[in-house]
Swiss-Prot record:
InterPro entries noted in UniProt: Dynein_regulator_LIS1, G-protein_beta_WD-40_rep, LIS1_N, WD40/YVTN_repeat-like_dom_sf, WD40_repeat_CS, WD40_repeat_dom_sf, WD40_rpt
Region (Disordered): 85-106
Ranges: WD repeats: 127-166, 169-210, 212-259, 262-301, 304-361, 364-405, 407-439
Main location: cytoplasm
The organism of origin for this protein: Phaeodactylum tricornutum (strain CCAP 1055/1)
Keywords for the protein's UniProt record, in alphabetical order: Cell cycle, Cell division, Coiled coil, Cytoplasm, Cytoskeleton, Microtubule, Mitosis, Repeat, Transport, WD repeat
Function: Positively regulates the activity of the minus-end directed microtubule motor protein dynein. May enhance dynein-mediated microtubule sliding by targeting dynein to the microtubule plus end. Required for several dynein- and microtubule-dependent processes.
Similarity-based family: Belongs to the WD repeat LIS1/nudF family.
Protein's name according to its UniProt entry: Lissencephaly-1 homolog
Length: 439
C-alpha cells in the first residue's frame, strides 16, 4: 500500500509523538526521526470538514489511529447484524403476507415442514441471579425479555445470544410480561403490587399502576376494535392477582376501570383473543372463566382440571393457515372458539369455549404443567413442565409428537414463540433462558 504525502506525514508525526512520550529510552530514535523528517516535530492539529483548524489533538495521534480500527470493525459488524435482522424480518413479513402469517417452510416435496423445536438449544442466556419466572418474545425484532425473582427485567437478542440491558424499577419478583401488538411498549407485573409500563424504544418506565392488594401474577394488553397484528394502540390492560381479582386498567389515565371478583382464589394467568373481543382468566380455583370484552361479564365457565391452572392460550384465526384443509383438528369448525390450558394436574386440555366442553386431555408430563402456547401454524400445542421437559403435541392426532427432555436443569417455568421467526424461548428455575431453533 502506497501512502500519500499527508498520510506519511501523519504517520511520522504519530510515531514521533508516541516515542517522545516514552521517555529517554527512545531518545536517539526520536532525534533520528526528527532529523529525517523535521515536520513530524510540529504539533499535530486536526481539521474540520471545511478545512479550518480544530486545534491541537488531545488524544495521542498513534493511539487514536490504532484504536480506531477495532472500533470501526465493531461498528461494521453491528451494522451488518442489523441489516441481516431487517432482511429476515422483511422476508418473513413477505412470506406472512402470501401465506397466512404462520411459521411454515417448504419440505421440497410440495408440503410444509413442521418447524418444531429441537435439541440442542441455540443459546443459553445467563445473567439473572434468581429464578426466571417469565419470558416474552418481541413481536417484530429478534429480542426477548425475561422477568425474574431478582426483581429485574432483562433484554436480550435471541439471535446472537447477546445481553442488551436491564430494566430496573420493581422491588420484588417480576411475575408477568406483555408486549403491545407492535412491540412499542412493554408491561411488567410484580409481587411488589405494581404494574409498570415501559417505552420499549427508550426503555424508560412511563407509568406505574397500583391497586391490587396482593401479588400480581399476569398482565395482558387488551386490543379493541382491531386485529392484534394491526392494532397500533392498546387502551386497556388486564391484570390478575393473588387478591382473587382481575382488574381492567385505562392506560391513558392510569386508573382502574373495573375490578372483577368471579374467582375465589389466586388468579394466576390471563389470555386474550387476537382481536380482544374475548379474554379468559384462570388460577388456583381450577376454573377457567371466559369473558366478552363488550360487556366485561363472565360468559362461560370451563371446568375439568383437578388442580391449579397455570397457563391458558387461545387458538385463534391468526394461528391457522388460510387453507381450510390445514385446520388443526378434526373437532374444529370455528377455530376462534378454542382455548388451551395447562395445569398442576399434569394435563394439557383443549376446550371448545362456546359449548364449555373439553375436547381432549393430553397426558404426557410427569409433573406440573407450567406454560402452554399454540404453534403459529395452529397444528401443535407446546408445553413446559416441572419435569424439566418441553413437549410438542399434535392436535390432529391427539398425541405427544416431540419431547425435549432435560430442556433445563430445573423446572421450565415459561415459554414463548415468535409468530414468524423460527425461534422458541424458555425460562427456568435454573436462572437461565434458552433459545431453541426450529426445524
Amino acid at each position: 500500500m502506497v501512502l500519500t504525502d499527508r498520510q506519511r506525514a501523519d504517520l511520522h508525526a504519530g510515531i514521533y509523538e508516541y516515542l517522545q512520550s516514552r521517555g529517554d529510552a527512545y531518545q536517539k530514535v526520536v532525534e533520528a526521526l526528527a532529523q529525517a523528517d523535521p515536520e513530524c516535530t510540529i504539533p499535530h492539529t486536526t481539521t474540520t470538514s471545511n478545512g479550518s483548524s480544530a486545534g491541537l489533538t488531545k488524544t495521542p495521534l498513534l493511539e487514536k489511529k490504532w484504536t480506531a480500527i477495532p472500533r470501526l470493525q465493531k461498528k461494521v459488524l453491528e451494522l451488518e447484524r442489523q441489516a441481516s435482522h431487517h432482511a429476515k424480518i422483511h422476508a418473513h413479513r413477505s412470506a406472512a403476507g402470501s401465506g397466512g402469517g404462520a411459521l411454515e417452510a417448504n419440505d421440497g416435496a410440495g408440503g410444509a415442514r413442521r418447524l418444531l423445536p429441537r435439541l440442542p438449544c441455540q443459546h443459553t442466556l445467563q445473567g439473572h441471579s434468581s429464578v426466571v419466572t417469565c419470558v416474552r418474545v418481541h413481536p417484530v425484532f429478534t429480542v426477548v425479555v425475561s422477568g425474574s425473582e431478582d426483581g429485574s427485567v432483562k433484554v436480550w437478542d435471541h439471535e446472537s445470544g447477546e445481553y442488551i440491558r436491564t430494566l430496573k424499577g420493581h422491588t420484588n419478583t417480576v411475575n408477568g410480561l406483555a408486549f403491545t401488538p407492535t412491540g412499542s411498549h412493554l408491561a411488567s407485573c410484580s409481587t411488589d403490587l405494581s404494574i409498570k409500563l415501559w417505552d420499549f424504544q427508550t426503555y424508560a418506565c412511563i407509568k406505574t399502576l397500583r391497586g391490587h392488594d396482593h401479588t400480581i401474577s399476569s398482565v395482558v394488553f387488551l386490543p379493541f376494535g382491531g386485529d392484534l397484528l394491526t392494532t397500533t394502540k392498546c387502551k386497556r390492560l388486564l391484570s390478575a392477582s393473588r387478591d382473587c381479582t382481575v382488574k381492567v386498567w385505562d392506560l391513558e389515565t392510569g386508573f382502574c376501570d373495573q375490578t372483577i371478583h368471579d374467582h375465589n382464589d389466586w388468579v394466576r394467568t390471563l389470555a386474550t383473543r387476537a382481536d380482544g373481543s374475548v379474554w379468559a382468566s384462570a388460577g388456583n380455583d381450577t376454573v377457567i372463566y371466559v369473558y366478552e370484552q363488550d360487556r366485561m361479564k363472565k360468559a362461560v365457565e370451563l371446568r375439568g382440571h383437578e388442580q391449579v391452572v397455570e397457563s391458558i392460550a387461545f387458538l385463534t384465526q391468526d394461528t391457522i393457515p388460510k387453507n381450510n384443509a390445514q385446520r388443526p383438528s378434526k373437532h374444529i369448525e370455528t377455530v376462534r372458539d378454542y382455548l388451551v390450558s395447562g395445569s398442576r394436574d399434569r394435563t394439557v386440555r383443549l376446550w371448545k369455549v362456546s359449548e364449555a366442553s373439553c375436547l381432549m386431555v393430553l397426558k404426557a408430563h410427569d409433573n406440573w404443567v407450567r406454560s402452554v402456547l399454540i404453534h403459529p401454524n395452529g397444528n401443535y400445542i407446546l408445553s413446559s413442565s416441572d419435569d424439566k421437559s418441553i413437549r410438542v403435541f399434535d392436535i390432529k392426532n391427539e398425541r405427544c409428537l416431540r419431547t425435549l427432555e432435560n430442556a433445563h436443569n430445573h423446572f421450565v417455568s415459561s415459554l414463548d414463540m415468535h409468530a414468524t421467526l423460527p425461534i422458541l424461548v424458555s425460562g427456568s428455575v435454573d436462572q437461565t433462558i434458552r433459545c431453541w431453533p426450529l426445524d
